[in-house]
């Protein structure tokens, strides 16, 4: 007898990234020599000075519940980071730490999307965004920007995607999967559109802030458009920059009423993020940042090597990215050469 599951779940596809990662793990367990290119995960170990603090936290008994939204110590480290690196001022009540930035964003989606509400998500996008909107009974709207636009939507595209039902705009820059990053001028232009639509909450996913090598310094929307400060939830985490994917620690800064709502949702799901991970995250955010710069240097070298190699393949083209550790190749001509109809078959 098959047991019924909700229509909500039936609308959502299992994460293809998780599925591919699981398949790679299975093949490795079978003794196959395979390289996994699925999950967005640094291959470096967590820097020793951070890992040591995590181990010390266990030994000193920092293994109990903390406040749902994170410890005061971690909040202060996040506040200092936002001020130091992004020019953003937040108080403790504006900060939420979660079990990964994925949870942070899901909390926000659940906090602002009612059934039938729309969320604008520029495509190409991280595969989880639309499904999280569907789980909230919302409708993902995905304006597409191709290689001819550098995988970045225009203000006109954003304006055209907005309706009276729009409640959320999600912007990931630098982008998973394209590596594209919006310039200060481009962010300002998108911000000018959003200023005309006060019902829209903006989520900026800045997870790849420190895996970045464009000539112009990284900037976040809330700092470029201070007029939108009261509507922007700036999300980030320690997973990518500090090679801490398994520690599961994300965070955000934003308007008190939204952050409070997100904390309420989190309090009824996971409660606080790991107390051990919080201690390690404090060490990451407050400590020596040379490890971040060193990893970024290697990611840039690998990026240049892979992109150059892809562009030598028949039927393949690949733009250079401004950051992240992804290469987003166009394989349309290659698919014609080998006689397949879509990228999954390829």
How should these model regions be labeled?
Residues 38-43, 56-74:
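A glycine-/small-polar-enriched, mobile loop at the entrance of the PLP active site in fold-type I
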């Amino acid at each position: 007898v098959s047991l019924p599951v909700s229509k909500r779940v039936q609308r959502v596809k299992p994460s293809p990234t998780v599925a591919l990662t699981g398949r790679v793990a299975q093949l490795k367990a079978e003794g196959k020599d395979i390289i996994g290119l699925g999950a967005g995960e640094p291959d470096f170990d967590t820097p020793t000075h951070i890992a040591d603090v995590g181990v010390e936290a266990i030994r000193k008994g920092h293994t109990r519940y903390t406040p749902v939204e994170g410890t005061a110590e971690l909040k202060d480290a996040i506040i200092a980071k936002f001020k130091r690196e992004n020019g953003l001022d937040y108080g403790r009540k504006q900060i939420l730490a979660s079990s990964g930035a994925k949870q942070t964003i899901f909390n926000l989606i659940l906090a602002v999307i009612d059934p039938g509400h729309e969320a604008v998500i520029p495509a190409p996008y991280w595969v989880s965004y639309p499904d999280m909107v569907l789980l909230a009974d919302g409708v993902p709207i995905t304006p597409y920007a191709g290689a001819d636009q550098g995988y970045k939507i225009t203000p006109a595209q954003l304006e055209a995607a907005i309706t009276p039902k729009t409640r959320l705009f999600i912007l990931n820059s630098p982008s998973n999967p394209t590596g594209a990053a919006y310039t200060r001028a481009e962010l300002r232009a998108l911000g000018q559109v959003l200023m005309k639509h006060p019902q829209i909450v903006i989520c900026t996913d800045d997870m790849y802030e420190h895996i970045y090598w464009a000539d112009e310094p990284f900037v976040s929307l809330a700092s470029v458009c201070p007029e939108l400060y009261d509507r922007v939830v700036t999300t980030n985490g320690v997973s990518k920059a500090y090679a801490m994917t398994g520690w599961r620690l994300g965070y955000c800064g934003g308007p008190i009423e939204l952050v409070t709502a997100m904390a309420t949702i989190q309090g009824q799901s996971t409660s606080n993020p790991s107390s051990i991970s919080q201690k390690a995250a404090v060490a990451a955010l407050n400590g020596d940042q040379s490890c971040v710069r060193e990893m970024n240097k290697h990611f840039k070298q690998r990026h240049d090597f892979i992109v150059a190699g892809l562009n030598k393949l028949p039927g393949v083209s690949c733009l250079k990215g401004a950051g992240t550790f992804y290469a987003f190749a166009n394989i349309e001509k290659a698919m014609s050469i080998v006689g397949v109809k879509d990228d999954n078959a390829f």
